């Protein structure tokens, strides 16, 4: 899980979602998981 000030989809399987007011990227590749913070 990377924590970045700006989260962007890396590949075409990345999905941008909002969870508890946080913007997150979920993907089938675990290295692409990101959270804004």
Swiss-Prot record:
Transmembrane segments: none
Any one GO MF annotation of this record: structural constituent of ribosome
Covalent S-S links between cysteines: none
SUPFAM superfamilies to which the protein is assigned, alphabetical: Ribosomal protein L36
One GO biological process term: translation
GO cellular component annotations of the record: cytoplasm; ribonucleoprotein complex; ribosome
UniProt KW keywords: Ribonucleoprotein, Ribosomal protein
Pfam families named among the record's database cross-references: Ribosomal_L36
InterPro entries, sorted: Ribosomal_bL36 (IPR000473), Ribosomal_bL36_sp (IPR035977)
Matching NCBIfam families: rpmJ_bact
The family this protein is said to belong to: Belongs to the bacterial ribosomal protein bL36 family.
PANTHER family: 50S RIBOSOMAL PROTEIN L36, CHLOROPLASTIC, LARGE RIBOSOMAL SUBUNIT PROTEIN BL36C
Protein name: Large ribosomal subunit protein bL36
Encoding gene (name): rpmJ
């Amino acid at each position: 899980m990377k924590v970045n000030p700006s989260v962007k989809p890396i590949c075409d399987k990345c999905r941008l979602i909002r969870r508890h007011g946080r913007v997150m990227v979920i993907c089938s590749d675990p290295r692409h998981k990101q959270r804004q913070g």
